[in-house]
Swiss-Prot record:
GO biological process terms on file: iron-sulfur cluster assembly
Family as reported in the entry's similarity comment: Belongs to the HesB/IscA family.
Listed name of the protein: Putative iron-sulfur cluster insertion protein ErpA
Binding residue positions for iron-sulfur cluster: 40, 104, 106
GO molecular function, one term: 4 iron, 4 sulfur cluster binding
Biological source species: Neisseria gonorrhoeae (strain ATCC 700825 / FA 1090)
Length: 112
């Protein structure tokens, strides 16, 4: 896909993912971003590395990396920006999702 993907992965996110893949010494890894039920607001975000792309996965390429999103999660993530931030409170992946009507204090769960 092009850089005009409906899900945006920032350069900071890509740099951290590239570092993590290098640490694992496995260039076949792809970052899977997903949404599932749970958390204090109804849905929660998740991240995991995966070597396998399922037939129905959406594949987004940026900066030489591959990101995977399953169809159910994709509908909740369209328009979202996925970033990586570092601050005094710690380092984390952050999803800025315009589809989320409410989010919990930690930012890892949301409702629509």
């Amino acid at each position: 896909m092009s850089d005009e993907s409906p899900i945006i992965f920032t350069d900071s996110c890509c740099a951290k993912v590239a570092d993590l893949i290098a640490e694992e010494n496995n260039p076949d890894l792809k970052l899977r971003v997903f949404v599932n039920g749970g958390g204090c607001s109804g849905f929660q975000y998740g991240f995991t590395f995966d070597e396998i792309k399922n037939d129905d996965d959406f594949e987004i390429e940026k900066n030489g990396l591959v990101f995977l999103v399953d169809p159910m999660s994709y509908q909740y993530l369209v328009g979202a920006e996925i970033d990586y931030t570092e601050s005094l409170q710690g380092s984390q992946f952050v999803i800025r999702n315009p589809n989320a009507e409410t989010t919990c204090g930690c930012g890892s769960s949301f409702s629509v």
